[in-house]
Amino acid sequence: MKESKKRVLVGMSGGIDSTATCLMLQEQGYEIVGVTMRVWGDEPQDARELAARMGIEHYVADERVPFKDTIVKNFIDEYRQGRTPNPCVMCNPLFKFRMLIEWADKLGCDWIATGHYSRLEERNGHIYIVAGDDDKKDQSYFLWRLGQDVLRRCIFPLGNYTKQTVRDYLREKGYEAKSKEGESMEVCFIKGDYRDFLREQCPELDAEVGPGWFVSSEGVKLGQHKGFPYYTIGQRKGLEIALGKPAYVLKINPQKNTVMLGDAGQLRAEYMVAEQDNIVDEDELFACPDLAVRIRYRSRPIPCRVKRLEDGRLLVRFLAEASAIAPGQSAVFYEGRRVLGGAFIASQRGIGLVIEQNKDWK
């Protein structure tokens, strides 16, 4: 198999971003090989046709079974545990980038490339993910679990561009129809409401969980709900309960099948606990004077401090208002636009004791 430092494997979905990625890298002199991972839905005909038009090698990897057994299963399991998952965060290290590395090795490619709107920066011997220039499309939040060995082989050509610039670029290159395509789905295997997807994939879920009670913070029953997996922390719309004032989901108790409701003020938090972290340089993270954390995609970074607990988890202290801490979501730590690491937001049960045990932390 031919090997070259200019041979790069591109993950091709057939969409706007991966098409632009291929064209840009071709212009830079790379030899492009495309691979399309079929994980859900129809045959990737668009990707085949685009690869043929660009004159590049193209392969299709049918990964529907392992994808369903890992990423989709995790997505469902998280909701069944009362957590709010982000499947892209799980998919990137466990599936997408792992598969790209395996195929790159098999096809003699030194590099892998994707259409993520993020950048990479080398500093002090480490590779850091950096937020892309387009704040509306930045995808650095989803990449925090990637290891250094993977990042050292990545190229993200779109990191310095806005989505509109990418559309304009495709139009200039003669890909007019492609430039006008709509946005891809936020979760690639779900069309519409995730609740319908849960019911479709788990027909037994409603019978298994059943209706439960909305309760107040004092434990007073407020009315019935459809089952705890169908609610997320911070949710206001779609509760189908009239309390005479706005109500938000504060807590979810899978064991009791209860969903606690309250007002917006009760969602605020000064601390949170996170787990299963991936930090680039711990000394840098813990000492960073300008550290901020993003607790959901597209949310504003919140100034914070972080310390390691004796049990290995992270305690995060917010230095500005934080609200709707949802277990299962990612907490991604930034210095400016540079990602220093991330972790999964843990269950906040027992956090009062953790705070008390660390009351001298400044």
UniProtKB/Swiss-Prot annotation:
Indicate the residues that form the catalytic site: 91, 188
Name the positions where ATP binds.
11-18, 37, 115
Sorted alphabetically, which CDD domains does this protein's record hold?
A: MnmA_TRMU-like
SS bond partners? 91-188
Could you say which enzyme class this protein belongs to?
transferase
> Which EC number(s) does the record attach to this protein?
2.8.1.13
* Annotated stretches, region: Interaction with tRNA: 137-139, 296-297
Reactions accelerated catalytically: S-sulfanyl-L-cysteinyl-[protein] + uridine(34) in tRNA + AH2 + ATP = 2-thiouridine(34) in tRNA + L-cysteinyl-[protein] + A + AMP + diphosphate + H(+)
The answer, when asked if Disulfide bond is one of the entry's keywords, is yes
Annotated site residues (Interaction with tRNA) in this chain: 116, 329
| Gene Ontology MF terms | ATP binding; tRNA binding; tRNA-uridine 2-sulfurtransferase activity
Q: Pfam families given for it? A: tRNA_Me_trans (PF03054), tRNA_Me_trans_C (PF20258), tRNA_Me_trans_M (PF20259)
Tell me the GO BP annotations in alphabetical order. tRNA wobble position uridine thiolation
- Where does the protein end up? Cytoplasm
Swiss-Prot/TrEMBL keywords: ATP-binding, Cytoplasm, Disulfide bond, Nucleotide-binding, RNA-binding, Transferase, tRNA processing, tRNA-binding
Question: Which Gene Ontology CC terms are recorded?
Answer: cytoplasm
Similarity comment? Belongs to the MnmA/TRMU family.
Q: What does this protein do?
A: Catalyzes the 2-thiolation of uridine at the wobble position (U34) of tRNA, leading to the formation of s(2)U34.
Which NCBIfam families does this chain map to? PRK00143.1, PRK14664.1, trmU
Q: What is this protein called?
A: tRNA-specific 2-thiouridylase MnmA 3
Q: Say which species the protein is native to.
A: Bacteroides fragilis (strain ATCC 25285 / DSM 2151 / CCUG 4856 / JCM 11019 / LMG 10263 / NCTC 9343 / Onslow / VPI 2553 / EN-2)
